[in-house]
Amino acid sequence: METLVVSKLNRGISTAKANRLLWLGRYAERVYLTLHMLRKHFDMMIDEDETAYVKFCTRMGIENKYSSADDFMKRKLFDSENPESVINMLERVKDNAILLREEIMTETLCYIELSIATMKNPAMQADGMAAMQQITDNILAFWGSIDERILNNEIRHTIKFGKYLESLELHMRFEYSLSRIKEIFDRLLHTIERDCYICEEITLLTMKEQLKLEKYPNKGLIYLVNSLANA
């Protein structure tokens, strides 16, 4: 996946903090949606095509370095040496959350720490995909805590901006319907209408026009998504 850096000083927060807030949102949403997509492909691997994980890797834009469906599921979920694993995504959320503890509150961070502890539990690892509902529930609670506990609008909106960027990219990669893409884009617009300094306005206008043309799926849209933050 392409990376994205926020380098413009925002009104009340530093460049470094803006980056951490945005990536906190992106990584948390990446965990949530990766698990969602994995469930669908896991069912396909059981019921239809045991090599469905190959298509998953292609759509995610990652290397297929797995020897089998079983190897894929184990390493994609629990392998701390695999930079694309869910456990590693959670560690990235945690790294940002620890540095932002004062902004997001300890209670919010606890949902991520609980998720990591769950992933490292041998009993949960033995259950595999069946145990991942707990992680999904924790991420939903994390987002609820973001909404409930963060009173600073600028901080909350920057995190949400990252969330919707990630949501747009992954839904595009997995070729969800144009109507679904537009729904997520509208949520992103709602966020940046409140704090428009977050967004690269020319790129935003280009993306609006592209969605109006309804030329989708379109790999160029993924590039635009990853160019939407001010650089």
What are these regions (language model features)?
Residues 2-231:
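Alpha-helical transmembrane segments and their helix-helix packing motifs
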